Amino acid sequence: MLPGQVLLTPAALMSTLPHQIRLIGGQWKRTRLGVPGVPGLRPTPDRVRETLFNWLGQDLAGWRALDAFAGTGALGLEAASRGAQSVLLVEQDARLAAALRQHQQRLSASAVQVLRGDGVAALHGQLAGSLDVVFLDPPFAAASLYAPALAAAAKALRPGGFVYLEADASWQGRPEAASFTLRRHLKAGAVHAHLFCKPLPTEEKP
């Protein structure tokens, strides 16, 4: 080490990053995590996240989750904090993926895995009916991802499973979500939050 050089622990290094998220429930409640300053990054607001997990339930014990455009990891880590059995965080950006791995290590989150790659491809790689919830929060500029992501999620989810989708106000993609039932909808500024459910066989339309 050079004279005057200070070596930061991973936790201290994360605290120097320009942005932070705060987990709001579960075993890591109130934990703050540093996030790299990446253009276009748009963490799900605390109020929206709190509403989402009120919809899903506070205890996700045994659930299997996939966060396809993880970004800050706020959605998937929140699920893990509330007891999800397994959470796969998928992120293409190298800096964000590295930060997610630091979060996983700092929290000793054994249920969390981080994959640097394409979220839609990761969904296609899941066994049919193997997931309980899929989080879809792609960049608003990437609206072309909604249709393939929803289609891939429909195959990966169990009947009765959930898809959470964040989109901007211009998204009018009801045909893209035709295989789901819209359970909840929330508007918060530019964010339109949708909670879809994959119908049970008895609920499917003829």
Q: PLM features: residue spans?
A:
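Class I S-adenosyl-L-methionine-dependent methyltransferase catalytic core
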Residues: 1-206
